[in-house]
Amino acid sequence: MKIFILLLLLSFTTLASTVEDLINESQEIVGVQSRTEYFSRKFLGTDYDPAGPLGEGLEGEIDQDPLYRFDRFDCTTFLETVISLARSRDSEDFNSIINLIRYDKGEVDFLKRHHFTDLQWIPENIHAGFFKEANRNFFKDDEIFTARADIDIKGWINKFTIDSLRLPSLTLEEKQRRLLNLKERVKNEPVREATVEYIKIDRILENPDLLSTLPDVVVVNFVRPNWNLKETIGTNMNISHQGLLIRIKDQFFMRHATQVSPLKVVEVHFLNYLERFKNHPTLKGVHFLEILEH
């Protein structure tokens, strides 16, 4: 166990140095959106991690994966990392910002993490001043639809097993104790409705010019209205994936950590990507967030 902790401490020291290097390399790039484009391009080719590569670090009660890393991402941690770097002047800035993006008021705790994009991640990060809703600013009212889902955090946690915990150095007995404690903490958690506005994929494919007024760099969320996942994860939800749209020579490309081959951060033509979801039974639309400057 001591060796495990020592290795983690060494890796954290290396990561802090990496943050400083990344930020120093980007000093001449001005503006959060421009810096977001820069850092998202820098991480193209990075491995996708289906298990979720980030946690609460060494002090984590449930997930002791690192608070940040640069060698692997899922779709959300890719966004969180890139935008945190884009807004930072040094490693101290970065540590503070990534925690604010990932956690309620920046308090590092598994149950305060923004696990649900529609219920937590979007509204909390709008409130924190990192984003603002783009749909109402760039699309007409008759082009906007609303998805609703009941988010059952207690039902989600009750689906957790010992294998859901990321606690490599703990005994089975201690893991069981922590799992029981986690379920106890959410026993009175109410079901809450999450709403998110979206533009239909089919409508965008019919009229790609709808995208023409969007900013050059924007967050895109993929909407599956009231997606029924109760049997698998214990709750419904509205959003299944996230990425960044980047305008390149008057066309939008999406950079995202993909869970299908090649399992890496990739850049794809956005309209071509949407084509595969035409008339899809559950994936109906996209939601946009404008990235705010400082």
Sequence positions of predicted segments:
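Sec-dependent N-terminal signal peptides
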Residues: 3-12
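C-terminal soluble interaction/assembly domains
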Residues: 218-294
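Helix N-cap / beta->alpha transition motif
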Residues: 194-207, 267-269
